[in-house]
């Protein structure tokens, strides 16, 4: 484990994955190095858990797959603010090959959406207790970079933050600036 201002690194021993993190003011940058012979590279987006978890904290979550390298969305929580919206935009350094989700809460009614398989490759994911996953082709590279921008205003604000603070730069360049 390595930790210094603007940089954190840890080996995820259970998976053999090296995780490196750095940041700008509004963007978190992740770099994952998978074992050379990995058959799968997966990122989990857990929209349920956070600091100070309790049942009823998450009011709603939405995840939208915009294209094969961009995911946007938001989470509405109840707590220190009645309806606090946190918007995000995530970009990936290589294309998503497959994605899906699991709804951890009971869904009583899905209306017209019932005719769709909303658990796999459905581009608009919504629910109270959502955990999504994104798979990537390990043959392209052992490394995957993920940039996650936040905004308290809108998804468009998160996209603007992503473009303004992390566009055109890779993990190493952004880590050097953060130090």
Language model: regions and residue ranges:
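Beta-sandwich/jelly-roll carbohydrate-recognition scaffolds of carbohydrate-active enzymes
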Residues: 1-179
């Amino acid at each position: 484990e390595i930790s210094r201002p603007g940089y954190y690194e840890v080996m995820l021993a259970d998976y053999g994955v090296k995780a490196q993190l750095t940041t700008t003011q509004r963007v978190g940058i992740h770099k994952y190095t998978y074992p050379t012979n990995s058959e799968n590279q997966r990122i989990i987006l857990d929209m349920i858990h956070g600091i100070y978890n309790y049942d009823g904290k998450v009011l709603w979550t939405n995840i939208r797959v915009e294209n094969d390298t961009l995911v946007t969305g938001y989470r509405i929580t109840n707590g220190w603010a009645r309806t606090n919206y946190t918007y995000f935009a995530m970009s990936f350094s290589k294309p998503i090959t497959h994605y899906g989700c699991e709804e951890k809460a009971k869904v009583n009614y899905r209306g017209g959406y019932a005719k769709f398989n909303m658990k796999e490759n459905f581009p608009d994911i919504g629910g109270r207790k959502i955990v999504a996953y994104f798979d990537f082709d390990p043959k392209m590279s052992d490394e995957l970079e993920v940039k996650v921008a936040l905004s308290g205003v809108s998804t468009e604000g998160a996209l603007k933050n992503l473009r303004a603070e992390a566009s055109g730069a890779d993990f190493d360049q952004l880590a050097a600036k953060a130090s």
